[in-house]
């Protein structure tokens, strides 16, 4: 449920910022840096600290760092809802949704052995046609997938591995057997 709640909050933030995404993204990065401090996290998750005190602290940070009002108001809602501990996950999903909105995504390509340029080019062509341009590509090998590839984007996974195909055949076989 936590992941779903993070997604919903991130979706709301994407809708709120609309054309102001660059300024808000910079503000989020500043907030994430501040939230890395253990004392800051402890302050915002402490149920004995009144909500008004937390809001005042956020407004002080807003003034000091020139943060967007929409962003700070959004964080106030997250704090009020008791989800400050999920803020990092919310922002991570926000960036993924924003990249998706812009036709971009982070991509990880996993193959059993290193891909040739031709193989990688073919995979990227297919993914670009369906999802847009990857912003960053991470390549790694995992002999455990036996062959083929797995492409993981921010919001999608394409499993064209042999292990994935075997898993799908197993699922279909079980359905066929149990439906008799």
From Swiss-Prot:
Task: List, alphabetically, the GO terms of the cellular component aspect.
Answer: plasma membrane; proton-transporting ATP synthase complex
One Pfam family per UniProt: OSCP
Q: How does it sit in the membrane?
A: Peripheral membrane protein
GO MF terms on file? proton-transporting ATP synthase activity, rotational mechanism
Q: Which InterPro entries match?
A: ATP_synth_OSCP/delta_N_sf, ATPase_OSCP/dsu
Keywords in UniProt for this one?
A: ATP synthesis, Cell inner membrane, Cell membrane, CF(1), Hydrogen ion transport, Ion transport, Membrane, Transport
Where does the record say this protein resides?
Answer: Cell inner membrane
- Record note on quaternary structure: F-type ATPases have 2 components, F(1) - the catalytic core - and F(0) - the membrane proton channel. F(1) has five subunits: alpha(3), beta(3), gamma(1), delta(1), epsilon(1). F(0) has three main subunits: a(1), b(2) and c(10-14). The alpha and beta chains form an alternating ring which encloses part of the gamma chain. F(1) is attached to F(0) by a central stalk formed by the gamma and epsilon chains, while a peripheral stalk is formed by the delta and b chains.
What is the purpose of this protein? Answer: F(1)F(0) ATP synthase produces ATP from ADP in the presence of a proton or sodium gradient. F-type ATPases consist of two structural domains, F(1) containing the extramembraneous catalytic core and F(0) containing the membrane proton channel, linked together by a central stalk and a peripheral stalk. During catalysis, ATP synthesis in the catalytic domain of F(1) is coupled via a rotary mechanism of the central stalk subunits to proton translocation. This protein is part of the stalk that links CF(0) to CF(1). It either transmits conformational changes from CF(0) to CF(1) or is implicated in proton conduction.
Would you identify the family this protein belongs to, as annotated? Answer: Belongs to the ATPase delta chain family.
Q: What is this protein called?
A: ATP synthase subunit delta
